[in-house]
UniProtKB/Swiss-Prot annotation:
Stretches of the chain forming a coiled coil according to its record: none
Organism phylogeny: Eukaryota, Metazoa, Ecdysozoa, Arthropoda, Chelicerata
Protein name: U1-lycotoxin-Ls1z
Signal peptide span: 1-19
Highest taxon of source: Eukaryota
Tissue: Expressed by the venom gland.
Length: 106
């Protein structure tokens, strides 16, 4: 059990460090991102529809939300695709481990 917790914590830390791409940007890239601040403010919040913009989801506490799509069948039998911004299961598990670690280690 301890090994599983340690492995999960390591995976979480690696995933978190790889998702923090802004920290690794050079100064020029950071300035261009700051110029596009308006675009970043218009990201799609969690649980909102992202069918037309699948890469526009906002960031959560640790990770960026992902656009998750499902096929919806209407009463008339038509199949349509419905997408929403949400947290993938493996990110939920990582956030749970990090939260648990923060409670234990302060």
């Amino acid at each position: 059990m301890k090994v599983l917790v340690v492995v999960a914590l390591l995976v979480t830390l690696i995933s978190y460090s790889s998702s923090e791409g802004i920290d690794d940007l050079e100064a020029d890239e950071l300035l261009s991102l700051m110029a596009n601040e308006q675009t970043r403010k218009e990201c799609i919040p969690k649980h909102h529809e992202c069918t037309s913009n699948k890469h526009g989801c906002c960031r959560g506490h640790l990770f960026k939300y992902k656009c998750q799509c499902t096929t919806v069948v209407t009463q008339s039998g038509e199949e349509t695709e419905g997408c929403f911004c949400g947290t993938p299961p493996h990110h939920k598990a990582a956030e749970l481990v990090v939260g648990f670690g923060k409670k234990i280690f302060g």
